[in-house]
Amino acid sequence: MNNKSNFKLEPDVLLQIYTTMRQIRAFENTTDELFKKGIVKGTAHSYIGEEAIASGVCTALDEGDYIASYHRGHGHCIAKGADLGRMMAELFGRKDGYCQGLGGSMHIADMDLNILGANGIVGAAMPLSTGAALAAKLRGTNQVAVAFFGDGASNQGIFHESLNLAAVWKLPMIFVCENNQYALTTSYRNTTAVAQVAQRAAAYDIPGITIDGNDAVEVHLTVLEALERARAGEGPTLIEAMTYRWGQHSLRANLQDPRPKKEVDSWLERDPLKQMENRLLSKKVASKKDIKAISDATNKEIENAVGFALKSKEPDMAVMLNSVYAPHKDHIEPGSTCNRTLSFVEALNEALHQEMALD
């Protein structure tokens, strides 16, 4: 993959990427503050320091493309266009949240936006995205599915199973490994045999590339190239975006941070938001006044989202019970006949097809 020079980013795209990064940073800073006050329920995993990845990826996607996320998923949902008020309400455990307050931070989904959901199960985004990509290919819709996951998830069996199937069937997929260096408290260097996760793509004969995950433009251009391959029927791409989470594993973390201070400080100096801001200024895409206006506007958006969430009601017990099962569908079982002779395997297959059609 070396055709990134074929793509030129217009000023409006650069501003869109930066604005999205600003939204994510403001949302996460506010989430952190409200968690400490006990307003955010459960736990949450901050995306601060990794904003360039979600913004660079999702601004390259078409509206109909799919994404699936993981426990550190606020940024992905925001970048794909999720409603900030409903997201905040979900974190508050309120009825107007995406899951009516029952899912919390790790389970935000919006099927209208093809956000298949964040997920508390490590690596679960990959099979969900693989299924979405298979459906898109069978329907011939030209949609692409993106799976976001961390470096720790690349050591799960489902990583290899998903890459293998996607490669065999040449599914329109992009696997985005957000390598923030640590799976909870364990460095990926102590758990991963290869130097880079992207090297594992070779086993499935698909492109694998390691990029600077703090450079939103590099992320965006790399994804544009992967999208071009996917829509052309050439199959999936594995992108490893090297980055760093600024805080501990979660906002509720009560473990000693094992990361060396010198290492943390060096990554903090590589602030992806500041890098993008400097790019806009140096290329005269935006002035300092424009930057401030974007910052003020995004802060106001988050303020409004908090206000919406605070006004939302707590879910009642009926919601808890009614949300457990899917709506029941009555259907009449086909009557039995005795005018055909079927083998056991044929009868079993026919019954399965009937049940699948009724599901």
Regions found by a protein language model. Give the residues of each.
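Short, ordered loop/turn segments at secondary-structure junctions
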Residues: R72, E178-Q181, G213-N214, M242-Y244
